[in-house]
């Protein structure tokens, strides 16, 4: 319950939007729990209610979709990721090169998926 309270209070405090859909294409989309982009800082927060080990990879993917959708390069913005779980949160700033790599994969494989869909 503590992480939920922290998550809600921080989302309000940072002026974040909740449940925002990010979409690169019909094949590549997702919903960020809380997100904001202000003064060159992209902030994405995720709430995990389970107790299993978490990874920031999902937030990296959301960041890549944000950059593609809104035409930003990950090197030109600051990025802050938070995952709330249990009684606390973890925070990181991903390497922009990692985000760029995800963006390149999305660009490369989206047309492949489209072609596969037309064959099925």
What would you call each of these model-derived segments?
Residues 1-43, 54-57, 69-76, 89-106, ...:
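Catalytic cores of nuclease domains that cleave nucleic-acid phosphodiester backbones
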Residues 4-6, 47, 62:
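Broad hydrophobic/π-residue packing in well-ordered secondary structure
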Residues 45-47, 83:
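Compositionally biased, intrinsically disordered low-complexity segments enriched
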Residues 47-53:
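Short beta-strand-loop-alpha-helix junction that forms the active-site gateway
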Residues 57-65:
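Short amphipathic alpha-helical face segments that pack within enzyme cores
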Residues 78-85:
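Extended hydrophobic secondary-structure segments that form protein cores and membrane-embedded regions
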Residues 111-120:
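Accessory terminal regions of nucleic-acid processing enzymes
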């Amino acid at each position: 319950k503590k992480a939920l309270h922290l998550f809600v209070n921080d989302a309000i405090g940072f002026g974040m939007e909740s449940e925002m859909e990010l979409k690169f294409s019909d094949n590549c989309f997702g919903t960020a729990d809380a997100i904001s982009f202000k003064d060159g800082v992209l902030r994405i927060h995720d709430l995990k209610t389970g107790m299993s080990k978490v990874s920031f990879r999902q937030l990296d993917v959301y960041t890549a979709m944000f950059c593609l959708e809104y035409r930003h390069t990950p090197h030109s913005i600051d990025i802050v990721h938070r995952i709330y779980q249990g009684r606390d949160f973890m925070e990181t700033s991903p390497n922009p090169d990692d985000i760029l790599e995800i963006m390149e994969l999305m660009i490369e494989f989206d047309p492949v998926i489209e072609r596969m869909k037309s064959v099925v």
